[in-house]
Swiss-Prot record:
<dbReference type="InterPro" id="IPR015947">
    <property type="entry name" value="PUA-like_sf"/>
</dbReference>
<dbReference type="GO" id="GO:0034599">
    <property type="term" value="P:cellular response to oxidative stress"/>
</dbReference>
<dbReference type="Pfam" id="PF02190">
    <property type="entry name" value="LON_substr_bdg"/>
</dbReference>
<dbReference type="GO" id="GO:0016887">
    <property type="term" value="F:ATP hydrolysis activity"/>
</dbReference>
<comment type="subunit">
    <text>Homohexamer or homoheptamer. Organized in a ring with a central cavity.</text>
</comment>
<feature type="binding site">
    <location>
        <begin position="597"/>
        <end position="604"/>
    </location>
    <ligand>
        <name>ATP</name>
    </ligand>
</feature>
<dbReference type="GO" id="GO:0003697">
    <property type="term" value="F:single-stranded DNA binding"/>
</dbReference>
<dbReference type="Pfam" id="PF05362">
    <property type="entry name" value="Lon_C"/>
</dbReference>
<feature type="domain" description="Lon N-terminal">
    <location>
        <begin position="155"/>
        <end position="444"/>
    </location>
</feature>
<keyword id="KW-0067">ATP-binding</keyword>
<dbReference type="Pfam" id="PF00004">
    <property type="entry name" value="AAA"/>
</dbReference>
<dbReference type="InterPro" id="IPR003959">
    <property type="entry name" value="ATPase_AAA_core"/>
</dbReference>
<keyword id="KW-0645">Protease</keyword>
<dbReference type="InterPro" id="IPR027503">
    <property type="entry name" value="Lonm_euk"/>
</dbReference>
<dbReference type="GO" id="GO:0004252">
    <property type="term" value="F:serine-type endopeptidase activity"/>
</dbReference>
<dbReference type="InterPro" id="IPR046336">
    <property type="entry name" value="Lon_prtase_N_sf"/>
</dbReference>
<keyword id="KW-0547">Nucleotide-binding</keyword>
Length: 1104
């Protein structure tokens, strides 16, 4: 039993006090039990109550100075006065921080109390609710600072989210549940400000009550409520309570207390006495002797397990065997609030034994401290946290408290909740340190990255600040000099004025406003200023909603088209149809036309004529050899020198949204590593997509559906299929001789005359000369070469006029001296004679003549005398253009030898030609040799013809029996003259077959017969193309009969003019038998074939 005087001696033992340190909730703060304790007053009057950590019930009061109470009755007991009756602690007192009272007593020595004399820091001294001295006391009363109970079997559970709490670090939590708020206030009022904080497993749950033990993590912390205050989160919302918690140690949740638990009659809190209804009913006389009924320390530890015993305290178990009390839980008074609050049975989380001198632990702690130092160098806030921890650490060596070091590492890290909970739940110091080291290493990486980002941002900001400072100085200087405006305001106003005249779509207007607002806030010296200015300039240059009125007058269009071009009936008819639809509807949508034809037939120039007839603006660009997609779709704004694509440039140039855009040479687009421009044209030339064409530079949709696109190409084979499918193809065939004559007389000759300066000179170019040019110099299907020769004729004529008349006959016009003109117009310019040049010694300056005259006056044209007359005829034509290029139209004009036939070919320049086929044989091994720069297809045609002849050798009369072998001992050589010209295509099949039969039957073919057509292996004749050019070549060569496939008859009737077909007999065949009968008509072999190789029916004939 510990006598009463022992407590007095303990109260008199001095203890050094430590100053209270107040820190933020994120920094480590000292335990509320650490501030300097109050003196335990030994005044004669006040009574001291010794309480158990497990809710003890007061049995008897004893005065420490052994002074008996005054005798106020017969039984010697002093009845309790009204002002001396102890009441529960008010809420206001509980919210006051114990630190205020600790500060007032910080200079006084602390008293180290045992577990049996622990008093609550939130409770007042006995006899007064505000902690003052009771009436009649001789001096101020001081209360000893309590020791936090080591065992607290039952606590109020508070669920928390986001992060778990760690011992030694404050945390503020907000409670919104009214029952829980009431429970917290009850805890403070009863002097038991202790709760358990457990982390919710589901962070999305927002609850103040634990209904299931599996909702929270099994390991939490035992916390002391240091202060509380209420707050209103919003109008109409319930009041919330914010409580500041200080965790002391780790605890483990065992079970939830059910609502059927026993409710206590009263609870005595640490630091004060709260008497229940039963205790109030008892008189002071019923209280037994204090020393005889206080239980021993070991009994309390065994039965209740809630008393914290200091190692320096005397063994009270031996001196206080007779101390007994009634067992009740500390928070028995909260059972009435079940199940609206969560009460849990908990136990302390035990730590596995470890050795402080373990090399592993010391190594990990050393690494932790090293990482702490590295982070502290990068983050000043982190440095403050570590400093505060070092100050609050009670141990002189950090190696003595590895658990606190691990907790600090977890608190300052921004790790995942599961990782933090793992540190909290770990019972092994080594494992806890390992986990904390991992978290701190991650924090170091984040700190390094944050430091790098911060340093980069600071560098940029400093640069911008310096630029801004200099710009402000520049503005001030300009203001002093009267140059306040830097032009940006005028620029912005100009953009606004342009935009007000355009009908921008809503989306484009929004982008314009955003970019203009950005431009206003940018400095002109900034690099982004020019980028934004150029972008806004392009936005305002696009003709949004601006279009030109179209002319749908059909007669006017016919007049313009005929004035500019001769022929081209198909193209002109299509344009007139387009205008007729527009006249009926009142408006037309954009179309995509593709003009395909040989070079020089006027595909590009017809585009200009179409635009002129429709009254539209014209823009042309070529895609021949184009490899960059950006030329069509534009460049990204991030590139230096970026600009929109060709369609947007066209709209800017023509300043209207319905122009005619000519895309030249679409069959010559190339592919490269940076994309396929042909694929980029798909969006632009698709009527379903070009309503919202997206340029990479502007990055806003643009309507191209009103644009009339006209494309030109020489061949269709090289145009991608998807692109060709989006265009309406119009074939522009070559010109015949009559058409070339009209074009030369009406267009080419007058233009060449003006270009040569002979507009007023009497020069006559006779039609015979033009015809000779077409026949012997310019056989291509177009007129470009013809134009060159006519220009050459007029140049020669101009030179002849000047040389014949001489310099005296054409005197120079009177021109004032150049120097006088220059000096009069530009007085600041020095005369040429006064100009000086810096020349390096020992060198010469080429092209520098100090005496050279300069002038800005245009030269006057010379006047040719009226008597000059130049006449260009067929006879003197070679004096102007040289000897003829083509001497004769066909190689064999008379009866050719056996093995020769006449075919018709289509040349690469778009013209036709008469091509003889020559075959000869010699002793050999049955080989077939082909010469004449023949292509793969024409070689295959020769093989097919040879195979047909061998298979029908007996019927043709080449062999005497069907079993006789043919040509096994002879080689055959096939040649097509003009080997410099490449030849390709299947159309020479019938001519090659005829030449083979002529050679093997030793029968000649009439030279006035020409043929064309593809043959199959079984003798069928298939249609071919280029009939207009081939017939024109046959007409020019004087061919009398043409053998053509029957499938080509519609093409001949539609596209070949009558002037070309005149004098020619057309034979339309379907089988090679018909070809052979027609080519060898009237010969002996043909008569024999009527029996051995008869025709199924006579071929169709037409004579023109």
């Amino acid at each position: 039993m510990l006598p009463l005087r022992a407590f007095a001696r303990l109260a008199q033992r001095p203890r050094l006090s430590r100053p209270t340190q107040l820190a933020r909730s994120s920094l480590p703060r000292p335990s509320p039990s650490r501030p300097a304790a109050h003196y335990l007053a030994l005044a004669p009057a006040p009574s001291t109550r010794f309480l158990h950590s497990s809710p003890p019930v007061l049995k008897e009061k004893r005065w420490l100075n052994n002074t008996p109470p005054e005798d106020d009755g017969e039984d010697g007991q002093n009845p309790k006065q009204d002002d001396q009756v102890e009441k529960p602690l008010p809420d206001a007192e509980s919210s006051k921080s114990a630190e205020e009272r600790a500060k007032s007593q910080s200079s006084k020595p602390d008293i180290k109390a045992s577990s049996s004399d622990s008093v609550s820091s939130s409770a007042p001294a006995p006899g007064s609710a505000d902690g003052g001295s009771p009436p009649g006391a001789g001096g101020p009363k001081e209360v000893a600072k309590p020791v936090i109970p080591e065992i607290y079997p039952q606590v109020l559970a508070i669920p928390i989210t986001h992060r778990p709490l760690f011992p030694g670090f404050y945390k503020a939590v907000t409670v919104r549940s009214p029952p829980v708020i009431k429970a917290i206030r009850e805890l403070q009022a009863h002097g038991q400000p202790y709760v358990g904080a457990f982390l919710l497993k589901d962070s999305t749950v927002d609850s103040d009550v634990v209904t299931d033990i599996n909702q929270v993590q099994p390991v939490g912390v035992f916390c002391q409520i240091t202060s509380c205050f209420t707050s209103q989160e919003g109008e109409g919302k319930p009041e919330a309570l914010t409580a500041v918690l200080f965790p002391h140690r780790r605890i483990k949740i065992n079970e939830l207390v059910k609502s059927s638990g026993t409710k206590g009659d009263g609870t005595v809190g640490v630091g004060g006495l709260v008497e229940g209804s039963q205790d109030s009913a008892k008189g002071e006389g019923e209280v037994k002797s204090f020393e005889s009924e206080v239980p021993g320390v070991e009994e309390v530890r065994e039965e209740l397990g809630t008393v914290s015993i200091d190692s320096e305290q005397p063994d009270v178990h031996k001196e206080n065997r007779d101390l007994e009390t009634k067992e009740v839980t500390q928070i028995d008074f909260l059972h009435s609030l079940l199940p609206q609050v969560s009460l849990t049975n908990v136990s302390n989380l035990s730590i596995e034994p470890y050795e402080k001198d373990s090399q592993v632990i010391r190594a990990i702690m050393s690494e932790l401290i090293s990482v702490f130092k590295e982070i502290a160098q990068l983050q000043p806030m982190f440095r403050e946290q570590v400093t505060s921890f070092a100050i609050s650490n009670t141990s002189s060596q950090v190696f003595d408290e590895p658990d606190k070091l691990a907790d600090l590492a977890a608190v300052v890290s921004t790790a995942d909740v599961s990782d933090l909970q793992a540190v909290l739940s770990s019972t092994s110091i080594e494992d806890r340190l390992q986990r904390a080291l991992v978290l701190l290493k991650k924090e170091l990486i984040n700190a390094q990255l944050q430091f790098k980002i911060s340093r980069d941002v600071d560098t940029k900001i400093q640069k911008r600040q310096r630029e801004y400072y200099l710009m402000e100085q520049l503005k001030g200087i300009k203001k002093e000099l009267g140059m306040e405006s830097d032009g940006k305001d005028k620029l912005v106003e100009g953009f606004k004025e342009k935009a007000s005249k355009l009908a921008m779509p809503e989306g484009v207007r929004k982008v314009f406003d955003e970019e203009l607002n950005k431009l206003v806030h940018l400095e002109p010296a900034a690099s982004e200023f020019n980028v934004t200015r150029n972008y806004i300039d392009w936005l305002t240059q696009v003709p949004w909603g601006v279009h030109t009125p179209e002319n749908y007058n059909i007669s006017h269009a016919i007049k313009i088209l005929d004035e500019d071009h001769y022929g081209l009936k198909d193209v002109k008819d299509r344009i007139l149809e387009f205008m007729a639809i527009g006249k009926l509807r009142g408006s037309v949508e954009g179309k995509i036309l593709c003009l395909v034809g040989p070079p020089g037939v006027g595909k590009t120039s017809i585009g200009k004529s179409i635009a002129k007839a429709l009254g539209r603006q014209f823009f042309r660009f070529s895609v021949g050899g184009l490899t960059d997609v950006a030329e069509i779709k534009g460049h990204r704004r991030t590139y230096i020198g970026a600009m929109p694509g060709k369609p947007i440039q066209a709209l800017k140039k023509v300043a209207t949204e319905n122009p005619l855009i000519l895309i030249d040479e679409v069959d010559k687009i190339s592919k490269a590593y940076n994309g396929d421009p042909a694929s980029a044209l798909l969006e632009m030339l698709d009527p379903e997509q070009n309503k919202s064409f997206l340029d990479h530079y502007l990055d806003v949709p643009i309507d191209l559906s009103k644009v009339l696109f006209v494309c030109t190409a020489n061949v269709l084979e090289t145009i991608p299929g998807p692109l060709l499918d989006r265009m309406e193809v119009l074939e522009v065939s070559g010109y015949v001789s009559a058409e070339k004559m009209n074009i030369a007389e009406r267009y080419l000759s007058p233009q060449a005359k003006v270009a040569a300066g002979l507009e007023d000179v009497n020069i006559e170019l006779e039609p015979g000369a033009i015809e000779a040019l077409i026949r012997y110099y310019c056989r291509e299907s177009g007129v470009r070469n013809l134009k060159k020769h006519i220009d050459k004729i007029y140049r020669k004529a101009a030179f002849k006029i000047v040389t014949d008349l001489g310099e005296s006959g054409l005197p120079e016009p009177a021109t004032p001296p150049a120097e006088n003109q220059v000096e009069a117009q530009y007085p600041d310019i020095k005369p040429a004679s006064e100009l000086t040049y810096n020349v390096i010694p020992g060198t010469e300056v080429s092209g520098v003549d100090t005496k050279t005259d300069v002038t800005t006056v245009p030269r006057e044209p010379m006047k040719v005398p009226a008597g000059i007359h130049v006449k260009v005829t067929q006879e003197n034509l070679k004096d102007y253009v040289g000897p003829p290029l083509y001497h004769k139209d066909r190689l064999y004009t008379h009866s050719p030898p056996a093995g020769v036939s006449t075919g018709l070919g289509y040349l690469g320049n778009g013209s036709g030609a008469v091509m003889p086929v020559e075959i000869n044989s010699m002793p050999g091994k049955g080989n077939l040799q082909l010469t004449g720069k023949l292509g793969e297809v024409i070689r295959e045609s020769a093989q097919i013809a040879m195979s047909w002849v061998k298979s029908n050798a007996y019927l043709l009369g080449i062999t005497k029996s069907e079993a006789e072998a043919t040509l096994n001992d002879r080689d055959v050589h096939l040649h097509m003259p003009e080997g410099g010209i490449g030849k390709e295509g299947p159309s020479a099949g019938t001519a090659i077959l005829t030449a083979f039969v002529s050679l093997f039957t030793k029968t000649r073919v009439d030279p006035d017969i020409a043929m064309t057509g593809e043959i199959s292996l079984l003798g069928q004749v298939l249609p071919v193309g280029g009939l207009k050019e081939k017939i024109l070549a046959a007409h020019r060569a004087g061919i009398k009969k043409l053998i053509v496939p029957a499938g080509c008859k519609p093409d001949i009737d539609e596209n070949v003019p009558e002037s070309v077909k005149g004098g020619i007999e057309f034979v339309f065949v379907e089988d090679v038998r018909q070809v052979l009968h027609e080519a060898f008509r009237g010969t002996e072999v043909e008569k024999r074939w009527q029996e051995t190789l008869p025709m199924e029916e006579e071929p169709q004939r037409e004579r023109h």
